Amino acid sequence: MDTFLFTSESVNEGHPDKLCDQVSDAILDACLKQDPESKVACESCTKTNMVMVFGEITTKAQVNYEKIVRDTCRGIGFTSPDVGLDADHCKVLVNIEQQSPDIAQGVHGHLTKKPEEIGAGDQGHMFGYATDETPELMPLTHVLATKLGAKLTEVRKNSTCPWLRPDGKTQVTVEYRNEGGAMVPIRVHTVLISTQHDETVTNDQIANDLKKHVIKPVVPAQYLDDNTIFHLNPSGRFVIGGPHGDAGLTGRKIIIDTYGGWGAHGGGAFSGKDPTKVDRSGAYIVRQAAKSVVASGLARRCLVQVSYAIGVAEPLSVFVDTYKTGKIADKDILALIKENFDFRPGMIAINLDLKRGGNLRYQKTAAYGHFGRDDPDFTWETVKILKPKA
């Protein structure tokens, strides 16, 4: 039997890049909660003792940017210099301007265009992917790496492993076989976890606790065997972490946010962007389309691409590839997708309820992946059953 190895990684919410994603999306949430028509392009960066937010925001909302930054960092667990950042004493820099009037007139006509007329906020191409290898219709490598990262945070915050600190990374290698284009996981080949820890814990305790409290509850026993390799803090020491260990930037973890290297990626990041930014809304609608194809039994794997021009409402192209797993021809699946999904940015925002912010709606997306989540706020995960014409 021919098999191959494929690997996906994840980072948890204390990674400096992910901290920045969460800050940017917390600001988006605050703007949309008060003003659903907010136009937000918010970037963040961080290094030792400093967080900066910068970008273009046009909103009627009254937003205390500094408070949002500090609250977000505190919620993650950055509460002292020892762990990499002190939310209450770090420097917070803010450099926010209004959206360019050139972009505003071209995209939404300074808020005068009807929803169906609103143009894309920029050019670009976005991909959605789905696969039947997991209940989430997501790649197993990505699902396991992401859940390991989430479990690391859970056992840190509930004090199961009090030696844990906020920063951490995971990586999972799975052995697969190709079944006529569909991906069938056979076993987990390697699990890698590198987690920040305090000064006192031993490497033996780190390894034992990670196996017992993180790996065992997350990785199904059917995928583990005597030959599974574990690399647990292989560098030997990870005390200095968070923004003290590495600088962080919004939009640096786009593969972790999506499909773990499977499918394809157009290059655009998600966090800090309102729904007129098709980097985000376009990627959400094509995930819904690809997931609906697989959930409807039309294919075992599906990739959907959409592309846009700035200021133009209709997409330039829509593409489908089922990797030869389709029950009907790809061109017929494409026709079904075009009939059932409206790819115009203004209509995506309405149909997926993307103008609704607050209550961590977008901040939740900024750690542990935007897709495959069982949460009603992730409206793009809702399946539309697609039926071929008789």
From Swiss-Prot:
Gene Ontology process terms (BP): one-carbon metabolic process; S-adenosylmethionine biosynthetic process
Keyword Cytoplasm: yes
Keyword Transferase carried by entry: yes
Record: residues binding Mg(2+): 9
Pathway of action: Amino-acid biosynthesis; S-adenosyl-L-methionine biosynthesis; S-adenosyl-L-methionine from L-methionine: step 1/1
Cellular location(s): Cytoplasm
Keywords per UniProt: ATP-binding, Cobalt, Cytoplasm, Magnesium, Metal-binding, Nucleotide-binding, One-carbon metabolism, Potassium, Transferase
Cofactor field: Mn(2+); Mg(2+); Co(2+); K(+)
EC number: 2.5.1.6
InterPro entries reported for this sequence: ADOMET_SYNTHASE_CS, S-AdoMet_synt_C, S-AdoMet_synt_central, S-AdoMet_synt_N, S-AdoMet_synthetase, S-AdoMet_synthetase_sfam
Top-rank taxon, per record: Eukaryota
Main location, first listed in the record: cytoplasm
Annotated L-methionine binding sites: 56, 99, 246, 277
Biological role stated in the UniProt entry: Catalyzes the formation of S-adenosylmethionine from methionine and ATP. The reaction comprises two steps that are both catalyzed by the same enzyme: formation of S-adenosylmethionine (AdoMet) and triphosphate, and subsequent hydrolysis of the triphosphate.
Subunit structure, interactors included: Homotetramer.
Protein name (database record): S-adenosylmethionine synthase 1
